[in-house]
Structure formats: C-alpha cells, structure tokens
Regions:
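Core nucleotide-handling region used for phosphoryl-transfer chemistry
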Residues: 1-218
C-alpha cells in the first residue's frame, strides 16, 4: 500500500513557514509571511517531487525592505506597495537551485544551466548568470601552474564585468553590489560566495549598530 502523500511546504532556511505544518510559525524575522506570497508565484510551476530554492527580493507587504544595509533598501528595481501587494511590482523571486526527489527518496540536482532553462520555459526569473564555463577559461592569461587559485580569486574579486566593488546594477538605490556565487557543476549542491569588500564593510557597520539581518538571525 502506497501511503505517500505529496503536499506543498515553504520554508526559510531550516524553519517550515507553512502554518498548516508548523502551528508555531508567525511572521518570523519580518513580522509578515512574505514566504507565502513567493510560494503562490512558484507553486503552479512545480511537479511532484520538485523543490525550488530562491531569493525573495524587493519589499514586504507592510512596505519594509526585505534586504537593507545602512538604512538603504536593496530594492532590485521594485517599489514599496501603496495598495495591493503585487509580484513583479513590489517584490520578485529569483530561483537559484532546483531539485527533484523521486518516490524512492533519491535526489536529482538540476545543473545551473538547467535551472536557467527551466525558468525561461516556465516564465520565472532565475538568478543572473554572468558567466558559464570553465574557470580556467575566464582569465586565459593566468598560468594554471603558478598560484592559479590565488591569482584567480584576486582577479575575480575586482572584476568590474561582474560588478565587483561597484554599486548594485539592479537596484535603483545606491547600494554596494553584494558579490557573486560560484556554482560547481558536479551533480551536487556545491557553491561558494565571493562577497564584495564594500558590502562586507557595510554589513560590519550595521552589526556594530545592532542591526541584524535575516541570515544572522537564522
């Protein structure tokens, strides 16, 4: 007898936000359930066994910023709501990872390219892809036999093509670009963040003032 039941769960990091499965949940860090609004956007596109991982960007239903630094909102081109809270106007969803779990519990990891293609097919927005290929081909002038790892990271950390140490290319407000994520194509969920120094400095100043972001809170 197959007693498997499929249903929808939405969560933030390790905390289930769906009130039907977590009766103790509330507005959490933000005081409002922005995760349910994002789930309403993504849910219609998921098949049984699929899990979508994404960033929610822009503003909250109460007008607060989802992400801010030094009092400035990372608006990502969105506007605070003046009435009905709307996807595409007040907030957005950017998908960065997809998995499929089969009935036996085995997990299949979508490649970074497949995530991009799936989002295009479904009319959803993936995270911005700046480069796809071998790391060694990004800077062919760097010798792979002479401290390549250190030289590669040093070059990447200041590469204006990726807006490193620049203002955010997607925000109307003048806020520092957060950085980039390097995703390794190895059928595993293996990714590394390279944050901009300007962003880290702003983050440190905010912490000194007692301002805590959602990642620190979690």
């Amino acid at each position: 007898i197959d007693d498997t039941r499929y249903d929808y769960l939405w969560s933030s990091r390790s905390v289930v936000k769906n009130p039907y499965y977590n009766g103790t949940t509330n507005g959490g860090f933000y005081g409002v359930d922005v995760w349910k609004y994002a789930d309403d956007v993504v849910r219609p596109h998921l098949q049984k066994g699929m899990t979508a991982y994404y960033e929610i960007v822009g503003f909250l239903p109460n007008g607060g910023a989802i992400q801010k630094l030094g009092g400035k909102a990372f608006d990502y081109g969105f506007e605070p709501p003046k009435g009905e809270y709307k996807y595409g106007e007040n907030f957005g969803v950017q998908i960065y990872r997809l998995t499929y779990t089969n009935p036996d519990g085995r997990v299949y990891e979508f490649s970074a390219r497949q995530v991009q293609q799936w989002c295009v097919k479904e009319g959803l927005k993936p995270v911005e892809e700046y480069y796809y290929g071998y790391a060694k081909d990004l800077y062919p002038d760097l010798s792979v036999s002479e401290h390549w790892n250190e030289n590669f990271l040093q070059r990447l950390a200041s590469d204006k093509n990726f807006f490193m140490e620049c203002e955010s290319p997607t925000c109307n407000n003048k806020v520092p670009h957060e950085g980039i994520v390097i995703k390794i194509e190895n059928s595993l969920s293996e990714a590394y963040k390279l944050k901009c120094i300007k962003f880290l400095e702003g983050e440190s100043k905010s912490l000194d003032k007692g301002e805590v972001d959602i990642e620190t809170e979690s």
